[in-house]
Regions:
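Phosphate-binding and adjacent anionic-ligand microenvironments
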Residues: 234, 271-443
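Gly/Ser/Thr-enriched, mixed-charge loops and adjacent short helices
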Residues: 12, 107-230
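An N-terminal, well-structured beta->alpha segment
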Residues: 1-62, 66-67, 148-175
Length: 443
């Protein structure tokens, strides 16, 4: 598609994604759902803490009400909160304004359908046609103009649902959380407070510009220091819209999404709660995870990269747990998309039930050394088709001699090529990755 990628319509604010785009999305969505139901559409809208999110919210909501839809404004909330409240409140559609883990200068618009799933591609194609001037939709007039509704109660209901999902106490547990100066800033602490935890929060003072800046799940160093210096039992880091979660164990070591899948998969299987005894990682997951799951008596079925593909594979096979190394973890029995705060609660459930530390729980999961880099390019397709790049990939694979692998793919959200190399030792992984990265950088 022209505008919508794997995680919505994303770009630099007022460059790749403009207020005109946001207004037109609102105009089409407001008309489309109203026409389909024969009555005013009800659309719920959330945002993250970027300065531009307020601008895009105003444009989007203007488009919605101009087309006759009622717009319910959740204000700042995690992306999974929008999906949750879309379903719980029986809304026609949910819209989240966020660029997730990207820098503050970027932003994005994600849409979910009434079932809380990412919007169907046929609807997104219709929106793209309207953005490009193919067809018109009528403006509402008189009492058919939509209303804007302050829907803070929706965020409170989402917080309450997170608390209610935990059937355990965290009394006496010292937990560090890094909110990335994003959507988790006003949501995560109340959840852990309600469960009795001693919560030590960092990076929860958003100013519109500091979202994801040297913090959150893409910059774990500060949380690692925080856990060690404060003597905490565990730490959790979210990204800008809190659909990702990575952890830090009591020793200050990062626990990535693959290890979280292992810990939760083994626990759920032990208690008969893992459908088919199967976990759904992605093709970018560490091969060590696959082997560790097999040694624990579990199966793994891989999906494409992206939580959309993970959940599609889970639905296809009736599986209940899947996720990505980056921290998108989906518990299919209770959610339809990755939820960072829910993930941290599920990890705490395992820690409390098994009476083990996070380092003890992850110890059996033996991951292979990896080297990863994202190389910015002008044309992603041309870069992958370049003969020099293809030769570098072949040479890297030959050097690994079947004892490792390389994965080179284009990002679905940024103009970058992602390079992953995996090998029995770190030096070999680094060498394979650098060989390919150098070829890409030479373009």
């Amino acid at each position: 598609m022209k505008y919508f990628g794997t995680d919505g319509f994303r770009g630099e604010a007022n460059v790749g994604l403009t207020v005109e785009h946001a207004y037109k999305i609102g105009r089409f969505v407001g008309w489309y759902y109203g026409a389909n139901r024969g009555a005013k559409a009800r659309v719920i809208v959330g945002k993250d803490t970027r300065r531009s999110s307020y601008m895009f919210e105003a444009a989007l909501v203007s488009g919605l009400v101009a087309s006759g839809a009622d717009a319910y404004m959740l204000h700042v909330i995690p992306t999974p909160g929008v999906a949750h409240q879309t379903v719980e409140g029986c809304f026609d559609c949910g819209i989240m304004i966020s660029a997730s883990h990207n820098p503050f200068c970027d932003n994005g618009i994600k849409l979910v359908n009434s079932d809380g799933f990412k919007m169907d591609e046929d609807v997104l194609e219709l929106i793209e046609d309207y953005i490009d001037g193919k067809g018109e939709v009528p403006l509402a007039t008189g009492n058919h103009i939509g209303a804007t509704v302050d829907y803070m109660q929706g965020r409170n209901r989402y917080i309450a649902s997170l608390i209610a999902s935990a059937n355990f106490s965290l009394q006496g547990v010292k937990i560090g959380i890094d909110c990335a100066n994003g959507s988790a800033s006003s949501v995560a602490k109340p959840v852990f407070d309600a469960l009795g935890a001693d919560v030590r929060v960092i990076n929860a003072a958003p100013d519109g510009f500091n979202i994801n800046v040297d913090c959150g799940s893409t910059h774990m160093e500060r949380l690692q220091r925080h856990v060690v210096e404060q003597g905490l039992d565990v730490g959790f880091a979210y990204d800008g819209d809190a659909d990702r979660c990575l952890a830090v164990d009591e020793r200050g070591r990062v626990v990535d999404g693959d290890q979280i899948l292992y810990v939760c998969g083994v626990y759920l299987n032990k208690h008969g709660r893992l459908s088919g005894g199967t976990v759904v990682p992605t093709i970018a997951s560490n091969f060590g995870l696959i082997k560790s799951l097999e040694l624990a008596g579990l199966s793994a079925v891989t999906s494409g990269v992206g939580d959309r593909h993970v959940y599609a594979k889970m639905r296809e096979g009736g599986y209940s747990l899947g996720g990505e190394q980056t921290g998108h973890t989906i518990f299919g029995d209770i959610e339809r998309t990755g939820d960072g705060i829910m993930t941290s609660l599920r990890v705490m459930e395992v820690i409390r039930a098994e009476r083990e530390t996070l380092s003890q729980l992850t110890a059996p999961c033996k991951l292979l050394p990896q080297a990863q880099v994202a190389v910015r390019v002008v044309d992603k397709d041309a870069a992958l088709e370049n003969m020099g790049v293809q030769n570098a990939i072949a040479e890297a694979e030959a050097a690994l001699a079947g004892e490792g692998r390389v994965l080179v793919r284009k990002s679905g959200t940024e103009s970058v090529i992602r390079v992953l190399a995996e090998a029995p030792d770190q030096a070999a992984a680094d060498a394979a990755m650098k060989r390919i990265a150098n070829a890409l950088e030479a373009l």
